[in-house]
Structure formats: structure tokens, C-alpha cells
Amino acid sequence: MAAMAFELLVLLVCIIAYAICRRRYLDSPVCAVPLMTAITWVLERAYARAPQSPRLGAVIICILICWRCAGSLALHVCTSMRTRGPSVIACLGCVLSPCIVACSLALPVAMGAKWHGAALFCANALHACGLWFSLSIAAFDRYARTHRCNPKDCVDVIIVPGAALRGSRPSPFLASRLERALELWREQGCCTHIVVSGGQGSDECVSEASAMHRYLAEQGVPDGLIIDESHSTTTKENMRYSRQLIEEHLGAGMRVAVVSTDYHLPRCAMFAASEGLDAVSVGASSAHRAWSRGYIRETVALTRAILPTYGIPILIALVCMP
């Protein structure tokens, strides 16, 4: 009875946190991931106390969720290592895949063996981490796939967040965003303003905004339609400073399209909503080999971004877990 009351309390707090997050970040998938993790975790714990058949079904479902994520991650890591050679991110992916599999088995093993105390606590924590990571990747991937088409309605401004440069030119990674923005710009009638947003890194000879401006100008975009934002260093600052420039040059209430790499879209959508932008997301397809690197990084970044909202239920779960 105490365990059930605790699980319902965690769910209630997660639902409240979800409502707060949804109000702030609108349709960003980051809102749903913690709630879905909590629901899956609570259902599995509840089914584990049920007769054998329901218990087995719940365990299989949760294990398959995690194993699908681990398998996709391993596949993309292998592709990346074959085409680009070993890297830190690739090695991290090689470690994460078996870790996710191990985490998916932690709680079923613990409950089957009737563990108690610290052992059960660790099993719960590991299992929750595996579910969190797996559901995050699934949610971000689905969001990216559903935002690859151009918006049906007209937009007033296109925002392109910066990325790494090669010398004074956009990297292929950044060029794919710019090409996607150009495609949307032409479809909108070649009269939409484009905000290129990105400061100058310590290892860059020009700002990302300057490099993007030159690239777009070479592709036929008039200088008068390109607005440079060259002070931001993070995605949050991209959205904040871009909003300020849009209001300064064009006024408030502009309809905005944020164009970025597909796996970067959830974080862009989250911060655009938090800045009050009326924005739609448009994704540029990432290279197959960059999939694992991008989703690992985005999962970590988004987890860090929402910790202030979901810190309370996480703390309750860790401290009070029966």
C-alpha cells in the first residue's frame, strides 16, 4: 500500500511539472519525456506486484523499448566509426548501448530476486535512467520526422541557429541548415527575412552569423533581407537575441520558422516557446553517421535544461523510494 501511494505521488507531481513545462515550452517533446518515463516506471512496478502473466508482459514491453533504442544507437555508432573512424562520441555510444540493455534488466532482476534496501534503490534508479534515455531518443526522433516538411502557412521570418565553421565558411553540417532555409525562403516567395544567429567561438576567425550571411548572399538572398545576430553562444541565446532583433527591425508578433538540424529541433522549439516566439520548426536532415552523436548530445542538453522543472519529482523518487 505504501509503495502504491508513493508511486501515485510521483505521478501526481510529474503531471503538475508536465503542465508547467507544457505551458512554458508548448509542443516541445521534452515536456512529455519525463512524464512518460514516470508512467512506464510506475506501471512496471505495479505490474511486478500482480500475477505472473501481467508482470511478464510489462517487463517485456519495457525491455523492448530500451533494447530498440540500444540497437538503433549501436547501428548508427558502427556506421559512424566505419565512415569517420573512432571518436569520443562513438566510443561513448559503444558504452551506452550495453548500459541501456543492462539498465532495462535491472528492475525485473531486482524484483524477481526480491532485493531490498540499497540494492533495490540502485536497480530502480538504473532502470529509470534506461527508460529516460530510450524514451528521450524515441520522442526526439519522432518530433524530427514530423517536422521535415515546410509549413503550410506563410512565415515572416526564418531563424537559422549557427554551428561550427571551417575557416570562414560554414561546415557541411551548417550548410545543410542554410540550404534548408533557402528552400523554405524560395517557397515563401523570396521576400521573407532571415535571421542568422551565432557568435564567434574561440577557435573561429569570424562569427557564425557573418559566415552564414555571406553564404546566403552568394545564393542570391538580398542583404536587406538578412539580419545578423552575432552575440549568441547557446541555443537559448540564439532564440532570445533573435527575438530582440526581430522586434527591433520588424516589430512584435511576427510568424517565425526555426530551421535547424532535425535532432536539434526539440531544443530550438523549447527555447523559442520560452521566449514567446510564434514559431514553427523546420528540420534539415542530418547525415546518417551523425545520428548517434546528435541524439546523445541533445538528450544530455535537454535533460540539463529541464532539471529545474522536474527536479522535485526526481528528488522525491530518489529520497522516498520504498
Regions found by a protein language model. Give the residues of each.
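Membrane-anchoring/interfacial helices and their immediately flanking loops
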Residues: 1-82
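Transmembrane alpha-helices and immediately adjacent membrane-cytoplasm interface residues
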Residues: 56, 63-85, 90-146
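Select subsegments of transmembrane alpha-helices in polytopic membrane proteins
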Residues: 31-32, 89-98, 304-310
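Aromatic-anchored segments of alpha-helical transmembrane domains
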Residues: 34-46, 98-106, 321-322
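Membrane-embedded alpha-helical hairpins and interfacial helices in multi-pass inner-membrane proteins
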Residues: 294, 301-305
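C-terminal single-pass membrane-anchor helix
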Residues: 304-322
